[in-house]
Amino acid sequence: MHSTTRREWLGAIGATAATGLAGCAGVGGAGQPVTVGSLLPLSGPGSLGALAADHQRAIDTAVEHANRGGGINGRDVVHVSKDTEADPSVAADRYATLAADESPLAIVGPVLSGVTTALTEQAAADAQLLVSPSTTAPAIATAGRSDGQKFVARTCPNDSQQAAVMAKIVDDDMYAAADTATILYVDNAFGAALADVLADRLGADLLASVPYQGGTDTPGGPVDDALAPDPDAVAFIGSPGSSSGVIDELVGREYGGEIALSSALASASSPPSWNGAYTATVNSASTVGTKRLRRALSDATPLQPYTENAYDAAALALLAASYSGDPTPRAVAGALQSVSGGVGHSITVGDFGRATDLIDAGRELNYNGATGNVDLTAALEPVTGYLIQQLTDAGIETRELLKSGYFTDGGDA
């Protein structure tokens, strides 16, 4: 991975701009504040509102840490959040207002793949950086480019990784060893995208790919369609909460094949009827950064999914602004990969002041955040490890760890 050094950045900015920025540095809070924006489903349905509230607090915490560490070139940071209502059209309006009124150095969000996908073209046209904590859609890897630069990033894994894990569960002799399979997927942007990538990755013959509506009261029909070809395995793609009724229907059938569940559906409290099913699970490291953030948000324990990713999204953007010496979206987008990894000095949650000192001394940074190692690729996304797990009477048991190299080396563990 090539990452631009600070010396290269200052050279790219130019001598005149660098001199002007140097004159602003160290004027403790004297300049106008800089803004981090966020687009979150604060009034979204079901558990989305609670998830968004935790994400909002995580971003607030990253901003607080930045201000405690001296801000960006001596300028305070403020966080301005807008409610997307989990609706792409509402999100587009709120994005336009946020970008025009606040000129944020970065916008954390959106949360949902469908909402993020709807904004990528406009963000690229505006040269406005979006950093999503939870958009896993594979298409985001190539979206949001303008004039040779990428303006859409994420701190969560690409679902192409999850597809590779689910395909391994279906195909591998250690697990389902299936010659034939069907896919049963939730009919939304996330489910359809993951189903498409999984279909391409499967070695087993795909007999059917069946959509279902999230929260459906009549799960029998889709399950009938998925089981009708008598597959050796069913790959089930769903979302927490809205898919549980369909899983219950599936596992309640007299079906002798194996079931592979997508990530975040199974837990230690899943019903005994789910036992035997396999699941793909992101390998979440509990690092110093993880523990620090959980302490900072201790009244919200347990944290909603992707809360750590939301902190990392804001923290990376703020570090990139400090590193580049230029708190504009274009400069921050260009420096994001540089501060996320490499051979620099390791920093973590709450280390913004130390990071600023290192930057001032001409040192490189390597951010190991609330989610652990966040090394971003040229697509501005991390490659993380996954676990293959199985539900048993004893709970969820890990069968295999697939390290990040499994995905970068073409599937060789």
From Swiss-Prot:
A GO CC term? plasma membrane
Gene ablation phenotype (knockout): Mutants completely lose the chemotactic response towards leucine, isoleucine, valine, methionine and cysteine, but they still respond to arginine.
Superkingdom of the organism of origin? Archaea
Write out the GO biological process terms.
chemotaxis
- What does UniProt give as the signal peptide span? 1-31
The disulfide bonds in this chain are none
Keywords noted in UniProt: Cell membrane, Chemotaxis, Membrane, Signal
Q: Where in the cell is it found?
A: Cell membrane
Describe the function of this protein: Mediates chemotaxis towards five attractant amino acids (leucine, isoleucine, valine, methionine and cysteine). May function as a receptor that binds the amino acids and transduces a signal to BasT. Has probably no additional role in transport.
* UniProt xrefs under PANTHER family: LEUCINE-SPECIFIC-BINDING PROTEIN, PERIPLASMIC BINDING PROTEIN OF ABC TRANSPORTER FOR NATURAL AMINO ACIDS
Protein's name according to its UniProt entry: Chemotactic signal transduction system substrate-binding protein BasB
